[in-house]
Amino acid sequence: MSSFFDYNNKFIQIMNKAADMMITSTMWILLCLTVVCIGPASTAIYHAMAKAVRYERESAFKEFWRSFKQNFWKSLFFGLLLTVFAVSIYFVDITANYDFLFNNAAPDGWALFGLIFKVVVLAILGLYVFPVISRFNMPIPRIFVSSLLLSIRHLLSTVFMLVVLFIAGYATISYPYLVFVLPGAFAFLQTFPMEKIMRAHMTEEDRVEDESVDQWYLDIENKE
């Protein structure tokens, strides 16, 4: 019986990870309800899933709040930027496609293309910007450019993450109670392609530094 409750027991480890996903998902939801904190919360949940759940450094709760505070302003900027972009899509592109989306009318080809294109760009930026902020200390313009370049350079991984994101979104709409676990679960799955992508663009010196328990953020700004 004692071995069943051993921390190294696989079942216990899985349950601990599931609990971390539920806790961080709930924190993410509550913070996103403020709208203003969407960016900082998104950076924090990725950081917590990568550092605490996948790499098992510290606790997910502790790392979530550490990242939330440490990356607040840059994440706030991009969170508000993407929120404004999303609102513009709603009022401009959704309105232009209203009859097609809600009244079964024939679609306007260009209007529909514009809607799909903008939604995909919004999703891609969201997928890359916040993990980059969680990993690298760099100026805001470089975060934006690096996120776009990484999404293009690693197109297959980008497509994979987009598909998983839209599946998660559809599942949440269909089964709303999943909102208490899917944000964390998605962020955890996202760490597998994203960590591989970001580590591929680190120098050998960066990789050595990254192996340290206390070293996590890579200060690109001060190295140049």
Show where each model-derived region lies:
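Helix-coil boundary and N-terminal low-complexity module in membrane systems
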Residues: 1-113, 124-128, 132-224
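Cyclin-like alpha-helical protein-protein interaction core
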Residues: 115-118
